[in-house]
């Protein structure tokens, strides 16, 4: 596989450990939700998302009901756009207060910097909101890496297991699918990207997946343990 025209990467389980997201970020947002909703429910950046949750679920517009719904979604790792937007706002305070910094795998940091230095456009596609993605890379233990990226995509462009989402991304960045490599730890996402012609790489880290995965469709994708093994 030669150097691509652009690289699109997932975050959780790909550039960063699953445990950081599930054991640090998710619990932090869960704990902060009651106070956040109480203090910001009328804020113009918050109210539309709470309204959406109430309308879609038939939940009475009360703080307790909304918090209970959102916490359940966190517990089940829901990718709902409203939840991701609200989580991002909560995490912003955590980053600003120095409550945590982002974990990034050293091999990912090294390759991201090298690709940027080689003028390869880098893009992020994650279920987390774009502001949350930017915070994630801005407040990492390796420093502010947000400037390495040319663009950011979240579920507003479509679900990560839907091939049309990758078509929209390719159109947005102006590069044919065959010129783009997508890096992810989720086989269903890679299948969707490959369906419209993206080159795909399954990142199968032992820290996140102790047993190498040899499942249906695994062999459709370049299958590596880390960014260090990438041939470009």
Swiss-Prot record:
Keywords tagged on the record: Amino-acid biosynthesis, Hydrolase, Magnesium, Metal-binding, Methionine biosynthesis
GO biological process: L-methionine salvage from methylthioadenosine
Alphabetical list of HAMAP family matching this protein: Salvage_MtnC
Catalytic activity: 5-methylsulfanyl-2,3-dioxopentyl phosphate + H2O = 1,2-dihydroxy-5-(methylsulfanyl)pent-1-en-3-one + phosphate
Note describing how the cofactor binds: Binds 1 Mg(2+) ion per subunit.
Co-factor(s): Mg(2+)
Lineage: Bacteria, Pseudomonadati, Pseudomonadota, Gammaproteobacteria, Lysobacterales
Subunit record text: Monomer.
Magnesium recorded as keyword: yes
E.C. designation(s): 3.1.3.77
InterPro entries: Enolase-ppase_E1, HAD-like_sf, HAD-SF_hydro_IA, HAD_sf
Gene for this chain: mtnC
Biological role: Bifunctional enzyme that catalyzes the enolization of 2,3-diketo-5-methylthiopentyl-1-phosphate (DK-MTP-1-P) into the intermediate 2-hydroxy-3-keto-5-methylthiopentenyl-1-phosphate (HK-MTPenyl-1-P), which is then dephosphorylated to form the acireductone 1,2-dihydroxy-3-keto-5-methylthiopentene (DHK-MTPene).
Family that this chain belongs to: Belongs to the HAD-like hydrolase superfamily. MasA/MtnC family.
Pfam family, one: Hydrolase
Any one Gene Ontology molecular-function term assigned to this protein's record: 2-hydroxy-3-keto-5-methylthiopentenyl-1-phosphate phosphatase activity
CDD domains, per database record: HAD_EP
Keyword Metal-binding found: yes
Highest taxon of source: Bacteria
Stated name of the protein: Enolase-phosphatase E1
Pathway(s) annotated for this protein in UniProt: Amino-acid biosynthesis; L-methionine biosynthesis via salvage pathway; L-methionine from S-methyl-5-thio-alpha-D-ribose 1-phosphate: step 3/6; Amino-acid biosynthesis; L-methionine biosynthesis via salvage pathway; L-methionine from S-methyl-5-thio-alpha-D-ribose 1-phosphate: step 4/6
Organism name: Xylella fastidiosa (strain M12)
NCBIfam families: enolase-ppase, HAD-SF-IA-v1
């Amino acid at each position: 596989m030669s150097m691509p025209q652009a690289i699109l990467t997932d975050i959780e389980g790909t550039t960063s450990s699953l445990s950081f997201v599930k054991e640090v970020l998710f619990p932090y947002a869960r704990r902060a939700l009651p106070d956040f909703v109480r203090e910001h429910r009328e804020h113009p950046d918050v109210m539309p998302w709470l309204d959406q949750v109430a309308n879609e679920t038939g939940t009475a517009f009360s703080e307790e009901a909304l918090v209970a719904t959102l916490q359940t979604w966190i517990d089940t790792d829901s990718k709902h756009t409203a939840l991701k937007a609200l989580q991002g706002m909560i995490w912003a305070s955590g980053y600003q207060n120095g409550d945590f910094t982002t974990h990034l795998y050293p091999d990912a940091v090294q390759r991201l910097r090298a690709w940027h230095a080689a003028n390869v456009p880098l893009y992020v596609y994650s279920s987390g909101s774009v502001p949350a993605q930017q915070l994630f890379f801005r407040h990492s233990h390796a420093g502010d890496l947000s400037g390495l990226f040319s663009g950011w995509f979240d579920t507003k462009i479509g679900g990560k297991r839907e091939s049309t989402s990758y078509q929209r991304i390719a159109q947005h960045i102006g590069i044919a699918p065959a010129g783009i490599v997508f890096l992810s730890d989720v086989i269903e996402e890679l299948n969707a990207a490959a369906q419209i012609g993206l080159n795909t790489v399954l990142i199968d880290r032992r820290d996140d997946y102790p047993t190498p995965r040899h499942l249906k469709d695994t062999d459709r994708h370049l299958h590596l343990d880390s960014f260090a093994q990438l041939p470009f």
